[in-house]
Amino acid sequence: MEIQLWKKILTPYELAVQEILVKFNHIIMEYRSADMYSPIEAVNGRVKSISSILEKCRKKNIPLEIVTEKVEDIAGIRVICQFVEDIYKVVDIIKKRKDMTIVEEKDYIKNVKPSGYRSYHVIVNYDVETLEGTKTIFVEIQVECPCGGWS
């Protein structure tokens, strides 16, 4: 695939990451403005690099023609919480939102990976407005706590 086509494919994902970061940062701001504790400590995001997408497609035998239908983490958001119990509060916030629809949840807190990895992954459908109209894309939201509070 040539670079111009990749740019066209990835642009909606870049927009989604930017929009969702603004929304989560606004949630933090709302809590703090009300002098309330925010379950969200910080948030960041990224769009997977072309080389990472190609490698994932190769490993999982995904044809490039259907990459946007099969690769659910091209757009990724990481929500950092201070405490483990905040993770579930953030997941509830995501579930109540009308601007994204949960399509899959993976609770690696209750179901710890063999590597010891703990996080809560939520795959959502998210609509972005482009020059070509509305595009619904997958965004993976990882909610985690880097604290040592795992028991």
State where each predicted segment sits.
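Short, flexible, solvent-exposed loop/turn segments with mixed acidic/basic and small polar residues
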Residues: 32, 61-71, 111
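Conserved phosphate/pyrophosphate-binding and hydrolysis machinery centered on Walker-type P-loop NTPases
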Residues: 10, 43, 80
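Short amphipathic alpha-helical segments
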Residues: 73-77
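An acidic, glycine-/histidine-flanked metal-binding catalytic module
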Residues: 1-31, 140-151
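Generic alpha-helical secondary structure
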Residues: 9, 13, 17, 50, ...
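Surface-exposed, low-hydrophobicity interaction/linker segments
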Residues: 20-21, 25-60
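Long beta-strand-rich cores associated with HINT superfamily self-processing modules
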Residues: 68, 81-151
